[in-house]
């Protein structure tokens, strides 16, 4: 197969391949960029594989950086752009089910491609557009099939994360996992415990944000992979309930983790514990803790000014997107109008602050000041008093007399 017109992203890198070839070596675009070119999907970055050893690449190009030279990776700097090239290699001795104990540089493209995960990712592309397909990856692309290169058990023992990549690709590409490959995942699922949770999280997030999350989730459940993920060990019923939902339009991590929080029926404290097991960022945890109650309020049509104020515009949007998945959402425009009606959108918009309380009302810094500002804020949000400095100071006088 020959691609007549390569996507524009390849053009600046073509002279790099040509220069390597002129020096007597082979060089190809490889991996996901080739797959996505054939599928007419967006290409995010390009990978180059070559028969030239790192020392030979450094001899060909004047400007290089050793980004992973022990694994054969050298970055070529060309006209201000960096291109990572990796020498053809074989790998052996995967004691941690993730990284090889030994890497051997080779001159054979075939040896390099046969260590890759799936046939659709084991394609190579010449700079002139000729596709090299040694493992029937083109046929599997046509069949929309995710199939391990060679023996699935060997591929998953080399890198157990490949099992999560398989179910993620099922969602991302809306493909089906090959029978033998699926069987291999079921048999090797316990190996997922050997993988760092951060890496598993990335794959799960991509799965739930993919083109067909239901397809990926179905395989995630059927293979038993979920049993080796933090907090999901006994979640088959909760996860399976997601398979009947068809309005999947999740946009970001906050939304997808909120869905899982809802499915697992987690309270605020449990949400924090669950997400910490997945080693998510603290700001994501805070966002999910806002989104989940807002989804429940949307479902019950109980969105109050206080809840909208505390949730904030971004989390409200996220909550309504999650609610759409369940068929609970309210009209986006209606939600936006309700939010915009709030007299203030954050505490900084209050007409007085701590300094005014000190100078005009004689309130000293401390817990009382915080309590007063909170009461004033909620009173303004709920339309009980106007956001006016004079009115607010009168209210302060009332509060201090009561207190």
Curated annotation (Swiss-Prot):
GO terms for biological process: RNA repair; tRNA 3'-terminal CCA addition. Keywords: ATP-binding, Magnesium, Metal-binding, Nucleotide-binding, Nucleotidyltransferase, RNA repair, RNA-binding, Transferase, tRNA processing. CTP binds at residues 32, 35, 116, 159, 162, 165, 168. It comes from the Bacteria. ATP binds at residues 32, 35, 116, 159, 162, 165, 168. InterPro entries: Bact_CCA-adding_enz_type3_sf (IPR050264), CCA-adding_enz_C (IPR032810), CCA-adding_enz_firmicutes (IPR023068), NT_sf (IPR043519), PolA_pol_head_dom (IPR002646), PolyA_RNA-bd (IPR032828). Mg(2+) binds at residues 45, 47. Homodimer. A single active site specifically recognizes both ATP and CTP and is responsible for their addition. This is CCA-adding enzyme.
């Amino acid at each position: 197969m020959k691609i007549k017109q390569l996507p524009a992203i390849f053009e600046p890198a073509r002279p790099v391949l040509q220069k390597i070839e002129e020096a007597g070596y082979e060089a190809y675009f490889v991996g996901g960029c080739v797959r996505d070119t054939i599928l007419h999907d967006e290409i995010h970055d390009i990978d180059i594989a070559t028969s030239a050893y790192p020392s030979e690449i450094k001899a060909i190009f004047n400007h290089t950086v050793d980004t992973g030279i022990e694994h054969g990776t050298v970055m070529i700097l060309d006209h201000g752009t960096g291109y990572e090239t990796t020498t053809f290699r074989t790998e052996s001795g995967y004691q941690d089910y993730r990284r090889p104990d030994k890497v051997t540089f080779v001159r054979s493209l075939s040896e390099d491609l046969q260590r890759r995960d799936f046939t659709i990712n084991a394609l190579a592309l010449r700079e002139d557009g000729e596709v090299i397909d040694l493992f029937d990856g083109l046929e599997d692309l046509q069949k929309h099939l995710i199939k391990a290169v060679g023996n699935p058990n060997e591929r998953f023992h080399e890198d157990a994360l490949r099992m999560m990549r398989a179910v993620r690709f099922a969602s991302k590409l809306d493909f089906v996992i090959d029978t033998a490959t699926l069987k291999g995942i079921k048999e090797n699922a316990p190996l997922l415990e050997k993988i760092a949770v951060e890496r598993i999280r990335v794959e799960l997030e991509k799965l739930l944000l993919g083109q067909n999350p239901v397809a990926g989730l179905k395989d995630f459940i059927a293979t038993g992979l979920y049993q080796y993920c933090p907090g999901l060990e006994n979640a088959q019923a909760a996860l399976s309930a997601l398979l009947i939902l068809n309005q999947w339009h999740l946009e970001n991590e906050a939304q997808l983790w909120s869905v899982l929080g809802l499915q697992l029926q987690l309270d605020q404290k449990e949400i924090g514990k669950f997400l910490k097991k997945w080693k998510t960022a603290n700001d994501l945890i805070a966002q999910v803790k806002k989104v989940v109650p807002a989804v429940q309020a949307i479902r019950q049509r109980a969105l109050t000014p206080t809840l909208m104020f505390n949730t904030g515009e971004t989390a409200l949007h996220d909550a309504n997107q999650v609610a759409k998945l369940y068929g609970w959402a309210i009209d986006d425009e209606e939600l936006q109008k309700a939010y915009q009606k709030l007299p203030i959108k954050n505490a900084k918009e209050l007409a007085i602050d701590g300094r005014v309380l000190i100078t005009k009302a004689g309130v000293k810094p401390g817990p009382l000041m915080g309590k007063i500002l909170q009461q004033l804020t909620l009173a303004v949000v709920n339309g009980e008093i106007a956001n006016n400095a004079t009115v607010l100071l009168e209210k302060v006088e009332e509060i201090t007399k009561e207190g």
